[in-house]
């Protein structure tokens, strides 16, 4: 009986020691990425206004235009794979305003940047805002939804989330 107990303890200690020395990566539970969205609406500079094509408009001025800058940051992306982000279609939203026949979305650009443990998605566009107030602009920006999806590298689990695009909208003085 004593030999069986000693043998069992010896076998148990061997298993514990071998488990501790294992080189296999331990799977950990990584949380979803942290998401932040910021939107800034500001007047154009003189230089920016000089680059805007205004021939189709009657008596346009620099004050009739605004630049919108949207930044989405995903932090904690080192453990994620197949990250996909779909930002709102602001061109469609601004050009199809109810009771407004004006083309509002003038032009825009965007960039996606992967850094260490974070991804940054930037969109910038120029709006023709004559006869629009800040609240109307904010309402249209706020209706947009940002859709994200990703997989966890260690578990292959797929996740997706939707965020309000208009959470942090700041207007800079005209």
Question: Where are the model-predicted features located?
Answer:
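Short, solvent-exposed, Trp/other aromatic-anchored flexible loops in extracytoplasmic proteins
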Residues: 100-156
């Amino acid at each position: 009986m004593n030999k069986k107990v000693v043998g069992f303890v010896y076998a148990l200690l061997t298993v514990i020691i071998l488990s501790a020395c294992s080189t296999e990566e331990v799977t950990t539970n990584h949380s979803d990425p942290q998401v932040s969205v910021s939107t800034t609406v500001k007047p154009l500079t003189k230089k920016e206004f000089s680059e805007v094509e205004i021939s189709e408009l009657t008596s346009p001025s620099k004050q009739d235009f605004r630049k919108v800058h949207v930044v989405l940051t995903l932090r904690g992306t080192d453990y994620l794979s197949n990250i996909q982000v779909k930002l709102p279609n602001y061109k469609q939203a601004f050009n199809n305003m109810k009771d407004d026949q004006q083309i509002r979305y003038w032009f825009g650009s965007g960039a996606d940047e992967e850094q260490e443990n974070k991804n940054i998605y930037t969109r910038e566009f120029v709006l023709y805002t004559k006869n629009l107030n800040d609240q109307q602009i904010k309402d249209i920006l706020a209706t947009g939804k940002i859709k994200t999806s990703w997989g966890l590298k260690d578990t292959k689990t797929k996740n997706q989330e939707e965020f309000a695009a208009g959470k942090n909208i700041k207007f800079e003085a005209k």
